[in-house]
């Protein structure tokens, strides 16, 4: 499909994001007030952080968006939430994923975040590695992606990143840590790694007393010792080490005891209702997983303060995992999981496909524009859909227990269902 034709199709999705200007659908909440210092006319309806743009002009360029941003501040009277009078800011996250060498998009997205977002989260696949691509080429792609961030992150917005399956092929864990770990350390200076050469770690952001501290956990589903597996196998296999799971349990328990809210980020999502797990089941020679409920079970136990003692057998014979969590009076407040991989904007809750359990875990998947068209996005996983998303801004409100999500680009669900330009998503089931 030629690009011009695609843009015409993408125009069908214009109602999903609004045409030219700020959507006013959420102005009814009198408790939400805009910061008018960034408003072009000095007054506007209350809105989450949204730039005005003209969908008809969209050609994969975030630079087309007019710089009209709102720094939302919310005021509430004394109520059962106990926050008192005053204002508080939401945490603003720029989420990008699966850019696959399209570094112009990386630069535009990082530029968008300057002075507007509190953190940038990249959920992997900066490169386009495969078993046919050598180590030097893979490292070159990671270096170019890193340079794209460094060249545009002038205000030093904290930057967090995790491995994608196309990043790790034919390179070692040490290679990736040197290439991307140093980039993360340069902007998220207080990041705490799980071990000296690991790419799993956590980073805390305290917004204010009302919002509290949010702890970001970067997870590594390609956690192999250098030389442990052939490079091609690391491309195909999702595997946690016992050391990472022990770290995860300890770090989540510490968050619960300190009252930190938690966001996890990884290239893949969780649960056997996820698209990527279904694909792995359908073609086990292409992708393979440990138990898809290993991490959800851990989070669930710490959310409810219950015990979990279990041996998670790995049917592939790669890495069995032991979990031993004792009961606790502390309760983990879990916000969401950020992921990529499937080249599709998604939101759903982790659950067992047989209906036996629903986890209180919100999954938020990010898409990306293709540098060479949109072949994967438009047809591979969701026929009859348009999924040309550049990035999303997520406003996390820990008082309302919700996330305001705004995506930049064109999106039309495969079933033709309407999509709000601003999506308000509760992150707790109850």
Where are these regions (language model features)?
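A short C-terminal boundary segment appended to hydrolase-like catalytic domains
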Residues: 38-68, 373-430
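Active-site environment of divalent metal-dependent phosphoester hydrolases
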Residues: 102-104, 128-130, 163-171, 224-227, ...
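N-terminal export signals
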Residues: 5-27
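Metal-dependent phosphoester/phosphodiester hydrolase catalytic core
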Residues: 80-95, 114-119, 158-160, 197-289
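Twin-arginine (Tat) signal peptide motif
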Residues: 1-7, 33
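Extended active-site neighborhood of metal-dependent phosphoesterases/phosphodiesterases
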Residues: 63, 67, 75-76, 135-250, ...
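N-terminal active-site segment of His-dependent metallophosphoesterases
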Residues: 34-139
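Conserved beta-sheet core of the metallophosphoesterase superfamily
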Residues: 279-400
